[in-house]
């Protein structure tokens, strides 16, 4: 291949790369602006958005963990009219004497200003690095449901919560 053809090939490749970079950056910025706009329009109760999505997952914040607790998750999923899946997981940084999770189900209507208690349960394990629990629940439609979890590993404690998902009547 001649030097001239190689130079043209490099220039064309560079132009193609730059044009793809500009298109990708523009698409990403547009998607972020759309998401920010749509989040601003959603109602919120006590830190949880009221959403129409099929599921929501929450996680512990890094600042609230200690030396034993690594992370924790909470999850709620709409299974159909009048039924949800709810639960959570606690993960320790290593094997601990006692690890646990407490799960609280709360519900609210769109016009409410606070969540009301619906159901709860807990699970503890010993000499392991994780605890998980979940349930399928029959629920009343016309409400948003969220899951709040308390995560513990030995003396470290943290919490997580989901957004509220709408369940059809």
Predicted regions mapped to residue ranges:
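N-terminal prepro-regions of secreted/extracellular proteins
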Residues: 1-77
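Beta-strand-rich interaction surfaces with strong enrichment in secreted/lumenal proteins
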Residues: 74-75, 119-124, 134-137
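Exposed aromatic-hydrophobic patches
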Residues: 88, 129-139, 163
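Short beta-strand elements
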Residues: 156-169
